[in-house]
């Protein structure tokens, strides 16, 4: 049984004061999350502030990126050791914006996954196709290649500690969302590949999140799919009321 994970990626939004206000709003309305995990990933500058607020609460702390070395002359980089020191439990790796804007490739992303694991951080590996790739019928090929490139050479135990986030690039910040059926089909494919690499028993335990214009009005239908185990939420995580509605999604039996 996989525990749903609802993760908020704040991207390059929120000053420390704004971060405090948002977290206080989340904590005020969170209530009993039951069988769900809640995660927020603020910008680096707000990590300490958010850590101090969420410590001892159901909200976990994550970062949006990490470098591959524990320390050294890497100006502007943040190491996994530093993230652990700040209380982070998770880190996003390979987000489509890191791939497209900052030129990160599969080799570097794979190294970041390994660096996170080596320092007891849970990496959230992001994979997904662009609109031209999807229109050309290559979506599955692209996503499978990204998963394999990042995880090749890892042991089943290592792969079992990773979270995958499927984020169709064409849906991020556009208001467009993959239909629940389309998202489920890709999640099922990802789980099959994870099974090929780590065994079906391990694959069955791995959380595969959906990311791409997740909103309060589509979360219930997405979470009704058998292989969608949570969401990586962008814009809708920047307001307490919308993220809380996502956290408290209605499961099919409700």
UniProtKB/Swiss-Prot annotation:
<feature type="binding site">
    <location>
        <position position="213"/>
    </location>
    <ligand>
        <name>substrate</name>
    </ligand>
</feature>
<dbReference type="InterPro" id="IPR022896">
    <property type="entry name" value="TrioseP_Isoase_bac/euk"/>
</dbReference>
<comment type="similarity">
    <text>Belongs to the triosephosphate isomerase family.</text>
</comment>
<dbReference type="GO" id="GO:0019563">
    <property type="term" value="P:glycerol catabolic process"/>
</dbReference>
<protein>
    <recommendedName>
        <fullName>Triosephosphate isomerase</fullName>
        <ecNumber>5.3.1.1</ecNumber>
    </recommendedName>
</protein>
<dbReference type="InterPro" id="IPR020861">
    <property type="entry name" value="Triosephosphate_isomerase_AS"/>
</dbReference>
<dbReference type="GO" id="GO:0005829">
    <property type="term" value="C:cytosol"/>
</dbReference>
<feature type="active site" description="Electrophile">
    <location>
        <position position="95"/>
    </location>
</feature>
<comment type="pathway">
    <text>Carbohydrate degradation; glycolysis; D-glyceraldehyde 3-phosphate from glycerone phosphate: step 1/1.</text>
</comment>
<comment type="subunit">
    <text>Homodimer.</text>
</comment>
<feature type="active site" description="Proton acceptor">
    <location>
        <position position="167"/>
    </location>
</feature>
<dbReference type="GO" id="GO:0006096">
    <property type="term" value="P:glycolytic process"/>
</dbReference>
<keyword id="KW-0324">Glycolysis</keyword>
<keyword id="KW-0413">Isomerase</keyword>
<dbReference type="GO" id="GO:0046166">
    <property type="term" value="P:glyceraldehyde-3-phosphate biosynthetic process"/>
</dbReference>
<keyword id="KW-0312">Gluconeogenesis</keyword>
<keyword id="KW-0963">Cytoplasm</keyword>
<dbReference type="InterPro" id="IPR013785">
    <property type="entry name" value="Aldolase_TIM"/>
</dbReference>
<dbReference type="Pfam" id="PF00121">
    <property type="entry name" value="TIM"/>
</dbReference>
<dbReference type="GO" id="GO:0004807">
    <property type="term" value="F:triose-phosphate isomerase activity"/>
</dbReference>
<comment type="function">
    <text>Involved in the gluconeogenesis. Catalyzes stereospecifically the conversion of dihydroxyacetone phosphate (DHAP) to D-glyceraldehyde-3-phosphate (G3P).</text>
</comment>
<dbReference type="InterPro" id="IPR000652">
    <property type="entry name" value="Triosephosphate_isomerase"/>
</dbReference>
<dbReference type="GO" id="GO:0006094">
    <property type="term" value="P:gluconeogenesis"/>
</dbReference>
<feature type="binding site">
    <location>
        <begin position="234"/>
        <end position="235"/>
    </location>
    <ligand>
        <name>substrate</name>
    </ligand>
</feature>
<comment type="pathway">
    <text>Carbohydrate biosynthesis; gluconeogenesis.</text>
</comment>
<dbReference type="InterPro" id="IPR035990">
    <property type="entry name" value="TIM_sf"/>
</dbReference>
<feature type="binding site">
    <location>
        <position position="173"/>
    </location>
    <ligand>
        <name>substrate</name>
    </ligand>
</feature>
<feature type="binding site">
    <location>
        <begin position="9"/>
        <end position="11"/>
    </location>
    <ligand>
        <name>substrate</name>
    </ligand>
</feature>
């Amino acid at each position: 049984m996989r525990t749903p994970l609802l993760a908020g990626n704040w991207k390059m939004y929120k000053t420390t004061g704004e971060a405090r206000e948002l977290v206080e709003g989340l904590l005020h309305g969170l209530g009993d999350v039951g069988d769900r995990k809640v995660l927020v990933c603020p910008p680096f500058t707000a990590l300490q502030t958010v850590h101090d607020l969420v410590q001892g609460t159901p909200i976990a702390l994550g970062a949006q990126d990490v470098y591959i070395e524990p320390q050294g002359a890497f100006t502007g980089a943040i190491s996994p050791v530093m993230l652990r020191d700040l209380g982070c439990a998770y880190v996003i790796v390979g987000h489509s914006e890191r791939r497209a804007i900052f030129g990160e490739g599969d080799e570097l992303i794979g190294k970041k996954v390994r660096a996170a694991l080596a320092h007891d951080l849970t990496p959230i590996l992001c994979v997904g196709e662009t609109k031209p790739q999807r229109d050309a019928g290559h979506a599955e090929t692209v996503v499978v290649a990204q998963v394999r490139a990042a995880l090749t050479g890892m042991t089943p135990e290592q792969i079992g500690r990773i979270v995958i986030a499927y984020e169709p690039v064409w849906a991020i910040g556009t208001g467009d969302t993959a239909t629940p059926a389309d998202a489920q089909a890709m999640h099922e494919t990802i789980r099959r590949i994870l099974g090929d690499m780590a065994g079906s028993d391990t694959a069955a335990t791995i959380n595969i999140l959906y990311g791409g214009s997740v909103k309060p009005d589509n979360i219930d239908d997405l979470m009704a799919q058998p292989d969608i185990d949570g969401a990586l939420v962008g814009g809708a995580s920047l307001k307490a009321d919308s993220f809380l509605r996502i956290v408290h999604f209605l499961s099919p039996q409700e």
